[in-house]
Amino acid sequence: MLLLRRYSGGSLYSILPIRASIESTIRHFNSLEPLQSSDSTPTKGDYFAAINHVVNIVRREIHPERSLNSLRLPVTSEFVFRVLRATSRSSNDSLRFFNWARSNPSYTPTSMEYEELAKSLASHKKYESMWKILKQMKDLSLDISGETLCFIIEQYGKNGHVDQAVELFNGVPKTLGCQQTVDVYNSLLHALCDVKMFHGAYALIRRMIRKGLKPDKRTYAILVNGWCSAGKMKEAQEFLDEMSRRGFNPPARGRDLLIEGLLNAGYLESAKEMVSKMTKGGFVPDIQTFNILIEAISKSGEVEFCIEMYYTACKLGLCVDIDTYKTLIPAVSKIGKIDEAFRLLNNCVEDGHKPFPSLYAPIIKGMCRNGMFDDAFSFFSDMKVKAHPPNRPVYTMLITMCGRGGKFVDAANYLVEMTEMGLVPISRCFDMVTDGLKNGGKHDLAMRIEQLEVQLRGV
Protein backbone atom coordinates (compact mmCIF):
# COMPACT_ATOMS: atom_id res chain seq x y z
CA MET A 1 0.00 0.00 0.00
CA LEU A 2 1.12 3.52 -0.70
CA LEU A 3 0.03 6.70 0.97
CA LEU A 4 0.09 10.09 -0.71
CA ARG A 5 0.40 12.80 1.95
CA ARG A 6 0.43 16.56 1.61
CA TYR A 7 2.90 18.81 3.34
CA SER A 8 0.95 20.61 6.02
CA GLY A 9 2.29 24.08 5.19
CA GLY A 10 2.77 24.07 1.43
CA SER A 11 1.96 22.58 -1.91
CA LEU A 12 4.49 19.76 -1.91
CA TYR A 13 3.31 16.17 -2.13
CA SER A 14 5.17 13.04 -1.29
CA ILE A 15 4.81 9.35 -1.86
CA LEU A 16 5.56 7.11 1.10
CA PRO A 17 6.10 3.45 0.18
CA ILE A 18 4.84 1.23 2.98
CA ARG A 19 4.77 -2.31 1.60
CA ALA A 20 5.00 -2.10 -2.16
CA SER A 21 8.39 -1.86 -3.77
CA ILE A 22 9.44 1.19 -5.74
CA GLU A 23 9.10 -0.77 -8.96
CA SER A 24 5.42 -1.45 -8.28
CA THR A 25 4.63 2.15 -7.41
CA ILE A 26 3.23 3.00 -10.81
CA ARG A 27 0.84 0.02 -10.71
CA HIS A 28 -0.56 1.09 -7.35
CA PHE A 29 -0.81 4.79 -8.07
CA ASN A 30 -4.37 4.50 -9.31
CA SER A 31 -5.58 3.63 -5.82
CA LEU A 32 -4.05 6.62 -4.10
CA GLU A 33 -5.99 9.36 -2.39
CA PRO A 34 -4.45 12.57 -1.08
CA LEU A 35 -4.78 12.56 2.67
CA GLN A 36 -4.91 15.64 4.85
CA SER A 37 -3.61 13.92 7.95
CA SER A 38 -0.85 15.74 9.78
CA ASP A 39 0.13 12.90 12.10
CA SER A 40 3.39 12.38 10.23
CA THR A 41 5.68 14.73 8.40
CA PRO A 42 6.89 13.48 5.01
CA THR A 43 10.48 14.24 4.20
CA LYS A 44 11.94 16.12 1.27
CA GLY A 45 13.15 12.79 -0.07
CA ASP A 46 9.56 11.56 -0.27
CA TYR A 47 8.63 14.59 -2.36
CA PHE A 48 11.43 13.96 -4.84
CA ALA A 49 10.50 10.28 -4.93
CA ALA A 50 7.04 11.34 -6.09
CA ILE A 51 8.60 13.47 -8.83
CA ASN A 52 10.77 10.54 -9.89
CA HIS A 53 7.74 8.25 -10.22
CA VAL A 54 5.91 10.79 -12.37
CA VAL A 55 9.02 11.25 -14.53
CA ASN A 56 9.21 7.49 -15.07
CA ILE A 57 5.58 7.44 -16.18
CA VAL A 58 6.15 10.29 -18.64
CA ARG A 59 9.29 8.70 -20.07
CA ARG A 60 8.23 5.06 -20.33
CA GLU A 61 4.51 4.82 -20.94
CA ILE A 62 3.00 5.06 -24.40
CA HIS A 63 -0.09 6.85 -23.08
CA PRO A 64 1.12 8.61 -19.92
CA GLU A 65 -2.00 10.79 -19.71
CA ARG A 66 -4.16 7.89 -18.53
CA SER A 67 -1.72 6.93 -15.78
CA LEU A 68 -1.26 10.55 -14.73
CA ASN A 69 -5.01 11.09 -14.53
CA SER A 70 -5.41 8.00 -12.38
CA LEU A 71 -2.96 9.40 -9.83
CA ARG A 72 -5.24 12.34 -9.03
CA LEU A 73 -2.17 14.38 -8.14
CA PRO A 74 -2.60 18.02 -7.15
CA VAL A 75 -0.69 19.81 -9.93
CA THR A 76 1.41 22.73 -8.68
CA SER A 77 3.78 25.11 -10.43
CA GLU A 78 6.88 23.80 -8.66
CA PHE A 79 5.92 20.19 -9.29
CA VAL A 80 5.46 20.78 -13.02
CA PHE A 81 8.74 22.70 -13.23
CA ARG A 82 10.72 19.89 -11.61
CA VAL A 83 9.20 17.26 -13.88
CA LEU A 84 9.93 19.40 -16.94
CA ARG A 85 13.52 19.84 -15.87
CA ALA A 86 13.91 16.09 -15.23
CA THR A 87 12.51 15.24 -18.68
CA SER A 88 14.34 18.02 -20.55
CA ARG A 89 16.46 15.49 -22.48
CA SER A 90 13.32 14.44 -24.32
CA SER A 91 11.49 17.57 -25.43
CA ASN A 92 8.53 15.58 -26.77
CA ASP A 93 7.95 14.02 -23.34
CA SER A 94 8.26 17.42 -21.67
CA LEU A 95 5.78 19.01 -24.06
CA ARG A 96 3.29 16.17 -23.66
CA PHE A 97 3.46 16.38 -19.87
CA PHE A 98 3.06 20.16 -19.94
CA ASN A 99 -0.02 19.91 -22.16
CA TRP A 100 -1.48 17.37 -19.73
CA ALA A 101 -0.75 19.66 -16.77
CA ARG A 102 -2.41 22.63 -18.51
CA SER A 103 -5.59 20.59 -18.90
CA ASN A 104 -5.87 20.45 -15.11
CA PRO A 105 -8.30 23.19 -14.04
CA SER A 106 -6.47 23.78 -10.74
CA TYR A 107 -3.15 24.53 -12.43
CA THR A 108 -2.12 27.94 -13.74
CA PRO A 109 1.27 27.87 -15.50
CA THR A 110 3.87 30.51 -14.72
CA SER A 111 6.77 31.84 -16.76
CA MET A 112 9.11 29.46 -14.92
CA GLU A 113 7.56 26.36 -16.52
CA TYR A 114 7.11 28.01 -19.92
CA GLU A 115 10.77 29.05 -20.06
CA GLU A 116 12.04 25.63 -18.98
CA LEU A 117 10.01 24.00 -21.74
CA ALA A 118 11.07 26.60 -24.33
CA LYS A 119 14.75 25.97 -23.56
CA SER A 120 14.24 22.22 -23.85
CA LEU A 121 12.55 22.60 -27.23
CA ALA A 122 15.25 25.00 -28.47
CA SER A 123 18.06 22.64 -27.50
CA HIS A 124 16.37 19.85 -29.50
CA LYS A 125 15.72 22.07 -32.58
CA LYS A 126 11.94 21.98 -32.06
CA TYR A 127 11.66 25.61 -33.11
CA GLU A 128 8.03 25.55 -34.26
CA SER A 129 6.84 24.16 -30.93
CA MET A 130 9.14 26.57 -29.11
CA TRP A 131 7.56 29.58 -30.83
CA LYS A 132 4.09 28.30 -29.96
CA ILE A 133 5.14 28.20 -26.31
CA LEU A 134 6.58 31.72 -26.50
CA LYS A 135 3.35 32.96 -28.12
CA GLN A 136 1.33 31.40 -25.31
CA MET A 137 3.50 33.27 -22.83
CA LYS A 138 2.89 36.55 -24.62
CA ASP A 139 -0.87 35.90 -24.79
CA LEU A 140 -0.86 35.33 -21.03
CA SER A 141 1.19 38.54 -20.49
CA LEU A 142 4.07 36.55 -19.03
CA ASP A 143 7.52 38.12 -19.32
CA ILE A 144 10.35 36.24 -20.98
CA SER A 145 13.59 36.48 -19.03
CA GLY A 146 16.81 37.65 -20.63
CA GLU A 147 18.43 34.34 -19.70
CA THR A 148 15.94 32.35 -21.77
CA LEU A 149 16.23 34.75 -24.68
CA CYS A 150 20.03 34.49 -24.63
CA PHE A 151 19.83 30.71 -24.48
CA ILE A 152 17.60 30.52 -27.56
CA ILE A 153 19.82 32.88 -29.58
CA GLU A 154 22.92 30.86 -28.71
CA GLN A 155 21.15 27.61 -29.62
CA TYR A 156 20.31 29.05 -33.03
CA GLY A 157 23.99 29.88 -33.55
CA LYS A 158 25.16 26.52 -32.22
CA ASN A 159 22.99 24.71 -34.77
CA GLY A 160 24.05 26.99 -37.65
CA HIS A 161 20.79 29.00 -37.88
CA VAL A 162 22.42 32.40 -37.60
CA ASP A 163 19.75 34.12 -39.74
CA GLN A 164 17.07 33.09 -37.26
CA ALA A 165 19.29 34.27 -34.40
CA VAL A 166 19.64 37.72 -36.02
CA GLU A 167 15.91 37.83 -36.75
CA LEU A 168 15.09 37.00 -33.14
CA PHE A 169 17.58 39.60 -31.90
CA ASN A 170 16.12 42.34 -34.11
CA GLY A 171 12.57 41.46 -33.12
CA VAL A 172 13.22 41.31 -29.38
CA PRO A 173 11.67 44.71 -28.48
CA LYS A 174 8.54 44.35 -30.64
CA THR A 175 7.91 40.61 -30.75
CA LEU A 176 8.79 39.60 -27.20
CA GLY A 177 8.79 42.92 -25.37
CA CYS A 178 12.35 42.49 -24.06
CA GLN A 179 15.30 44.85 -24.04
CA GLN A 180 18.48 44.40 -26.06
CA THR A 181 20.83 44.25 -23.09
CA VAL A 182 24.57 43.57 -23.08
CA ASP A 183 23.85 39.90 -22.37
CA VAL A 184 21.55 39.68 -25.41
CA TYR A 185 24.22 41.32 -27.57
CA ASN A 186 26.77 38.84 -26.23
CA SER A 187 24.52 35.91 -27.14
CA LEU A 188 24.18 37.08 -30.74
CA LEU A 189 27.92 37.73 -30.81
CA HIS A 190 28.43 34.13 -29.65
CA ALA A 191 26.11 32.87 -32.41
CA LEU A 192 27.99 34.85 -35.08
CA CYS A 193 31.36 33.57 -33.88
CA ASP A 194 30.06 29.99 -33.91
CA VAL A 195 29.62 30.27 -37.70
CA LYS A 196 32.87 32.27 -38.15
CA MET A 197 31.08 35.51 -39.17
CA PHE A 198 33.70 37.73 -37.57
CA HIS A 199 32.97 40.80 -39.71
CA GLY A 200 29.35 40.65 -38.60
CA ALA A 201 30.44 40.16 -35.00
CA TYR A 202 32.71 43.20 -35.15
CA ALA A 203 29.90 45.24 -36.74
CA LEU A 204 27.61 44.15 -33.91
CA ILE A 205 30.07 45.50 -31.33
CA ARG A 206 30.19 48.85 -33.16
CA ARG A 207 26.38 48.93 -33.13
CA MET A 208 26.44 48.07 -29.44
CA ILE A 209 28.70 51.05 -28.74
CA ARG A 210 26.49 53.38 -30.84
CA LYS A 211 23.50 52.31 -28.72
CA GLY A 212 25.35 53.47 -25.60
CA LEU A 213 26.08 50.01 -24.19
CA LYS A 214 29.51 49.25 -22.76
CA PRO A 215 31.09 45.90 -23.65
CA ASP A 216 31.89 43.68 -20.68
CA LYS A 217 34.53 41.00 -20.23
CA ARG A 218 32.40 38.32 -21.89
CA THR A 219 32.01 40.54 -24.97
CA TYR A 220 35.75 40.69 -25.44
CA ALA A 221 36.27 37.04 -24.50
CA ILE A 222 33.70 35.75 -27.03
CA LEU A 223 35.27 37.56 -29.96
CA VAL A 224 38.85 36.83 -28.91
CA ASN A 225 38.03 33.14 -28.39
CA GLY A 226 36.38 33.02 -31.79
CA TRP A 227 39.33 34.59 -33.55
CA CYS A 228 41.82 32.39 -31.72
CA SER A 229 39.86 29.24 -32.57
CA ALA A 230 40.10 30.25 -36.24
CA GLY A 231 43.84 30.87 -35.92
CA LYS A 232 43.43 34.64 -36.29
CA MET A 233 45.70 35.82 -33.49
CA LYS A 234 46.62 39.02 -35.32
CA GLU A 235 42.98 40.07 -35.72
CA ALA A 236 42.29 39.38 -32.05
CA GLN A 237 45.22 41.55 -30.98
CA GLU A 238 44.23 44.35 -33.38
CA PHE A 239 40.68 44.28 -32.05
CA LEU A 240 41.87 44.68 -28.46
CA ASP A 241 44.23 47.49 -29.45
CA GLU A 242 41.49 49.34 -31.31
CA MET A 243 39.05 49.05 -28.42
CA SER A 244 41.71 50.44 -26.10
CA ARG A 245 42.29 53.39 -28.43
CA ARG A 246 38.56 54.11 -28.39
CA GLY A 247 38.59 54.18 -24.61
CA PHE A 248 36.76 50.87 -24.12
CA ASN A 249 39.44 49.09 -22.14
CA PRO A 250 38.43 45.49 -21.37
CA PRO A 251 37.82 44.58 -17.70
CA ALA A 252 40.62 42.03 -18.09
CA ARG A 253 43.98 42.71 -19.66
CA GLY A 254 44.20 41.97 -23.36
CA ARG A 255 47.01 39.46 -22.98
CA ASP A 256 44.97 37.48 -20.45
CA LEU A 257 42.08 37.32 -22.90
CA LEU A 258 44.42 36.17 -25.65
CA ILE A 259 45.89 33.45 -23.43
CA GLU A 260 42.44 32.16 -22.50
CA GLY A 261 41.41 32.31 -26.15
CA LEU A 262 44.41 30.23 -27.20
CA LEU A 263 43.70 27.68 -24.48
CA ASN A 264 40.03 27.42 -25.42
CA ALA A 265 41.06 26.90 -29.05
CA GLY A 266 43.55 24.19 -28.08
CA TYR A 267 46.72 26.14 -28.94
CA LEU A 268 48.58 25.15 -25.79
CA GLU A 269 52.10 25.78 -27.09
CA SER A 270 51.19 29.28 -28.27
CA ALA A 271 49.69 30.06 -24.85
CA LYS A 272 52.83 28.79 -23.11
CA GLU A 273 55.01 30.90 -25.40
CA MET A 274 52.97 34.02 -24.67
CA VAL A 275 53.16 33.45 -20.90
CA SER A 276 56.91 32.89 -21.09
CA LYS A 277 57.33 36.21 -22.90
CA MET A 278 55.17 37.92 -20.27
CA THR A 279 57.17 36.58 -17.34
CA LYS A 280 60.48 37.46 -19.00
CA GLY A 281 59.21 41.01 -19.29
CA GLY A 282 58.27 41.07 -15.61
CA PHE A 283 54.52 40.62 -16.11
CA VAL A 284 52.17 37.85 -14.98
CA PRO A 285 48.62 36.86 -15.96
CA ASP A 286 45.77 37.43 -13.54
CA ILE A 287 45.02 34.58 -11.15
CA GLN A 288 42.02 33.27 -13.11
CA THR A 289 44.01 33.03 -16.34
CA PHE A 290 46.98 31.54 -14.48
CA ASN A 291 44.83 28.80 -12.95
CA ILE A 292 43.24 27.95 -16.30
CA LEU A 293 46.70 27.79 -17.87
CA ILE A 294 48.33 25.50 -15.30
CA GLU A 295 45.28 23.21 -15.34
CA ALA A 296 45.51 22.82 -19.11
CA ILE A 297 49.29 22.33 -19.07
CA SER A 298 49.21 19.82 -16.20
CA LYS A 299 46.60 17.75 -18.04
CA SER A 300 48.98 17.59 -21.00
CA GLY A 301 51.62 16.05 -18.71
CA GLU A 302 54.04 18.99 -18.49
CA VAL A 303 53.92 19.27 -14.71
CA GLU A 304 57.52 20.50 -14.43
CA PHE A 305 56.66 23.52 -16.57
CA CYS A 306 53.73 24.28 -14.24
CA ILE A 307 55.98 24.14 -11.16
CA GLU A 308 58.54 26.43 -12.77
CA MET A 309 55.83 28.87 -13.82
CA TYR A 310 54.34 28.81 -10.31
CA TYR A 311 57.59 29.87 -8.64
CA THR A 312 58.30 32.47 -11.33
CA ALA A 313 54.84 34.00 -10.99
CA CYS A 314 55.12 34.09 -7.19
CA LYS A 315 58.46 35.92 -7.42
CA LEU A 316 56.82 38.48 -9.72
CA GLY A 317 54.10 39.14 -7.13
CA LEU A 318 51.21 36.92 -8.20
CA CYS A 319 49.02 36.00 -5.21
CA VAL A 320 47.90 32.43 -5.86
CA ASP A 321 44.66 31.07 -4.39
CA ILE A 322 43.38 27.71 -3.20
CA ASP A 323 42.44 26.68 -6.76
CA THR A 324 46.10 26.95 -7.74
CA TYR A 325 47.05 24.41 -5.10
CA LYS A 326 44.11 22.17 -5.99
CA THR A 327 45.65 21.83 -9.45
CA LEU A 328 49.35 21.66 -8.61
CA ILE A 329 49.42 19.35 -5.57
CA PRO A 330 47.56 16.41 -7.20
CA ALA A 331 49.60 16.87 -10.37
CA VAL A 332 53.02 16.70 -8.68
CA SER A 333 51.88 13.88 -6.38
CA LYS A 334 50.77 11.81 -9.36
CA ILE A 335 54.24 11.89 -10.93
CA GLY A 336 55.90 10.95 -7.62
CA LYS A 337 57.34 14.35 -6.64
CA ILE A 338 56.34 13.99 -2.99
CA ASP A 339 58.87 16.52 -1.67
CA GLU A 340 57.54 19.13 -4.08
CA ALA A 341 53.98 18.30 -3.05
CA PHE A 342 54.88 18.90 0.60
CA ARG A 343 56.48 22.25 -0.27
CA LEU A 344 53.33 23.31 -2.07
CA LEU A 345 51.17 22.14 0.84
CA ASN A 346 53.30 24.12 3.29
CA ASN A 347 52.97 27.20 1.06
CA CYS A 348 49.22 26.66 1.03
CA VAL A 349 49.11 26.57 4.85
CA GLU A 350 51.35 29.65 5.09
CA ASP A 351 48.92 31.48 2.80
CA GLY A 352 46.23 30.87 5.41
CA HIS A 353 44.42 27.92 3.84
CA LYS A 354 43.35 24.93 5.90
CA PRO A 355 44.04 21.82 3.77
CA PHE A 356 41.02 20.06 2.33
CA PRO A 357 40.93 16.29 1.80
CA SER A 358 41.36 16.93 -1.93
CA LEU A 359 44.74 18.51 -1.16
CA TYR A 360 46.32 15.99 1.20
CA ALA A 361 44.75 12.81 -0.22
CA PRO A 362 46.85 12.89 -3.43
CA ILE A 363 50.01 13.19 -1.32
CA ILE A 364 49.02 10.15 0.76
CA LYS A 365 48.26 8.20 -2.40
CA GLY A 366 51.61 9.18 -3.94
CA MET A 367 53.47 8.10 -0.80
CA CYS A 368 51.71 4.75 -0.80
CA ARG A 369 52.58 4.25 -4.46
CA ASN A 370 56.24 4.82 -3.57
CA GLY A 371 56.01 2.29 -0.73
CA MET A 372 56.25 4.97 2.00
CA PHE A 373 53.38 3.53 4.03
CA ASP A 374 54.69 4.46 7.49
CA ASP A 375 55.25 8.06 6.39
CA ALA A 376 51.81 8.10 4.78
CA PHE A 377 50.14 6.86 7.98
CA SER A 378 51.98 9.45 10.07
CA PHE A 379 51.07 12.26 7.66
CA PHE A 380 47.43 11.13 7.65
CA SER A 381 47.38 11.28 11.46
CA ASP A 382 48.68 14.85 11.33
CA MET A 383 46.07 15.87 8.78
CA LYS A 384 43.24 14.52 10.94
CA VAL A 385 44.30 17.06 13.58
CA LYS A 386 45.53 20.02 11.54
CA ALA A 387 43.34 19.90 8.42
CA HIS A 388 39.72 19.37 7.49
CA PRO A 389 38.46 15.92 8.55
CA PRO A 390 38.95 13.10 6.04
CA ASN A 391 35.89 12.10 4.07
CA ARG A 392 34.70 8.80 2.63
CA PRO A 393 36.76 8.97 -0.60
CA VAL A 394 39.97 9.56 1.41
CA TYR A 395 39.39 6.52 3.60
CA THR A 396 38.40 4.43 0.58
CA MET A 397 41.60 5.43 -1.21
CA LEU A 398 43.75 4.72 1.84
CA ILE A 399 42.16 1.31 2.45
CA THR A 400 42.59 0.44 -1.22
CA MET A 401 46.26 1.46 -1.24
CA CYS A 402 46.87 -0.56 1.95
CA GLY A 403 45.30 -3.57 0.29
CA ARG A 404 47.45 -3.19 -2.80
CA GLY A 405 50.53 -2.97 -0.60
CA GLY A 406 49.60 -6.01 1.47
CA LYS A 407 48.92 -3.92 4.61
CA PHE A 408 45.62 -5.64 5.41
CA VAL A 409 45.82 -5.14 9.20
CA ASP A 410 46.25 -1.39 8.68
CA ALA A 411 43.43 -1.46 6.17
CA ALA A 412 41.21 -3.16 8.75
CA ASN A 413 42.08 -0.52 11.34
CA TYR A 414 41.16 2.29 8.94
CA LEU A 415 37.97 0.45 8.06
CA VAL A 416 36.94 0.40 11.73
CA GLU A 417 38.06 4.01 12.22
CA MET A 418 35.98 5.01 9.23
CA THR A 419 32.83 3.49 10.69
CA GLU A 420 33.50 5.17 14.04
CA MET A 421 33.39 8.51 12.22
CA GLY A 422 29.96 7.65 10.83
CA LEU A 423 31.22 6.89 7.32
CA VAL A 424 29.98 3.68 5.69
CA PRO A 425 32.65 1.81 3.70
CA ILE A 426 31.81 0.46 0.27
CA SER A 427 31.37 -3.30 -0.16
CA ARG A 428 34.58 -3.61 -2.16
CA CYS A 429 36.62 -2.44 0.84
CA PHE A 430 35.06 -5.06 3.11
CA ASP A 431 35.65 -7.81 0.56
CA MET A 432 39.26 -6.81 -0.07
CA VAL A 433 40.13 -6.56 3.63
CA THR A 434 38.46 -9.82 4.69
CA ASP A 435 39.97 -11.77 1.78
CA GLY A 436 43.42 -10.36 2.52
CA LEU A 437 43.19 -11.14 6.22
CA LYS A 438 42.05 -14.71 5.55
CA ASN A 439 44.87 -15.27 3.06
CA GLY A 440 47.30 -13.98 5.70
CA GLY A 441 45.97 -16.38 8.34
CA LYS A 442 44.26 -13.71 10.47
CA HIS A 443 40.87 -15.39 10.54
CA ASP A 444 39.71 -13.89 13.85
CA LEU A 445 40.22 -10.33 12.63
CA ALA A 446 38.58 -11.21 9.31
CA MET A 447 35.55 -12.54 11.19
CA ARG A 448 35.27 -9.32 13.20
CA ILE A 449 35.34 -7.28 9.97
CA GLU A 450 32.59 -9.49 8.53
CA GLN A 451 30.51 -9.00 11.67
CA LEU A 452 31.02 -5.24 11.36
CA GLU A 453 29.68 -5.33 7.81
CA VAL A 454 26.64 -7.30 8.95
CA GLN A 455 25.95 -4.76 11.70
CA LEU A 456 26.21 -1.85 9.28
CA ARG A 457 24.21 -3.30 6.43
CA GLY A 458 21.85 -5.54 8.35
CA VAL A 459 22.52 -8.50 6.07
UniProtKB/Swiss-Prot annotation:
Subcellular location field: Mitochondrion
User: Could you tell me which residues the PPR repeats occupy?
Assistant: 110-144, 145-175, 181-215, 216-250, 251-285, 286-320, 321-355, 356-390, 391-425
Which GO cellular component does the record give, naming just one?
mitochondrion
Q: Name one GO biological process term.
A: RNA splicing
- What are the boundaries of the transit peptide? 1-7
> What family is reported?
Belongs to the PPR family. P subfamily.
Name of protein: Pentatricopeptide repeat-containing protein At5g18390, mitochondrial
Organism source for this protein? Arabidopsis thaliana (Mouse-ear cress)
The organism's taxonomy opens as: Eukaryota, Viridiplantae, Streptophyta, Embryophyta, Tracheophyta
